[in-house]
Amino acid sequence: MSDTPRKLSLNKLSLKRDSAPEAPKLEERLHKVLAQAGLGSRRALEQRIADGLIKVNGAVAQTGMSVRSGDKIELDGRSFVASALTESSRVLVYNKPEGEVTTREDPEGRPTVFESLPALKGSRWIAIGRLDINTTGLLLLTTDGELANAMMHPSYEVEREYVVRVRAPEGEEKVPDSMIERLSRGVLLEDGGAKFDEIERIGGTDSHDWFRVVVKEGRNREVRRLWESQGCQVSRLKRTRYGKVSLPRELLRGQSVELAQEKVDALRAELKLEEGAPSALTLQPVIGQRRAAKSTVHVSRDGRSNAYVNGQTSGADEGRELRRFDNLREDRGGRGGRGKPGGFKGGLTVSGEAAAKQSQQRPFKQRGPAKGDRSLPDGNPAAFRSWYVPDGVSTGPSGHRNAGPGGAGTGQPRPYAKKGPGGARPGAGGQGRGAAGGQGQSQGQGQGQRKHPYGHPGNAPSFPSDHANPGFSPYGAARPANESYKRRPPRH
């Protein structure tokens, strides 16, 4: 037995398990990762890298550089993180209706196709080509950016088939065959030559013709511009096929269905893309990054201005909510001083900010001295006086403020030319003048001419104390001037 002391070894207890060795980080070329995320074609992205428009981990990216999972990439003011792609490619078939645009965010607030798609976790849908707002039919979307760029690129010559309804040009009952042959040979558009690779007449009516056309390019509004170059008008346009994928007949508008994985693999094989996972890396947007600051909306004089919609400033006419407070409206003259001469005359007025500007720009006009009574203008009085009553129009009984025939001038003949009861009425017999001061006609055929013209307050019913002649009574014959007025005794 040895006398040498033995050293005791203490084993440390730990709850940590032996971690597996870290897998090497995936590495891919930058432009390939950007294309996989659906940010553009590889050639266009290489040019943007060369122009210094892309940053990796805060530094300007260089042409041909590679990125690894976890690297931070900045592009167009947005931040992304490179991450491994864990699922295979997916393709969605969507039957696009009219009124939807093929953009993620529309500055004019119109509905987009992405609002109707199923949600994704860890990836996003990328549109394969675009359809304008009035075009319906097949729209393909995928999570594979490389597949999307290959199907859209003209070098792959992927066919797009459309059904189109066309109205013949002016002077033609239908689209002539010579025009169809010209479109199949090729015509010159603003951005170069274009043609229909296939064109077939499939029907028509007295006013329209139906065609099936095929193109191998995806230029902006190419089908419509080809027909418009020949003076034809496209009234309906629907895409029915894209490559080997056709629009299912049972798929309703606004609905989508996912393509089977076997067909997705067949698409990649046809385009000679790599089998299996499309790429090792993709981009994920950084969570919580701030949007651009909201801009203030200023309404100009004509009511048009830029507006803030969905975090962006639109250059379109987006002042609908503000312009409604500056609409022109018509005010008609009402009763009182508005409808009469010299009063307020209805016209077009404005309200809101436009009215405030008009009041500030209107010069101050000082009121001059009084000009006295104005003479009536010549011509028809009805043109400038709404209360004018023409001759021959009955407006009320005689003696009333609105007197009838004879109250304003020479009276009309009485029935049977008989005198009234109780003898001749004042001013109604012979050529004598009555109490009314008018000129009577013979045979009692009218009342006397009033002392005052029509409308004068003197013609209104009044009491003796209010009338110029104290002997006048509207209830009986005239009282002699020397007879004093006797007050009726009070009733008990």
From Swiss-Prot:
EC number in record: 5.4.99.22
Its biological purpose: Responsible for synthesis of pseudouridine from uracil-2605 in 23S ribosomal RNA.
Gene3D superfamilies with a match to the protein in the record: Alpha-L RNA-binding motif (3.30.70.1560), Pseudouridine synthase I, catalytic domain, N-terminal subdomain (3.30.70.580), RNA-binding S4 domain (3.10.290.10)
Enzyme class, first EC level, given as a word: isomerase
Protein family: Belongs to the pseudouridine synthase RsuA family.
SMART domains: S4
Official protein name in the record: Ribosomal large subunit pseudouridine synthase B
Protein's UniProt keywords contain rRNA processing: yes
Organism: Xanthomonas campestris pv. campestris (strain ATCC 33913 / DSM 3586 / NCPPB 528 / LMG 568 / P 25)
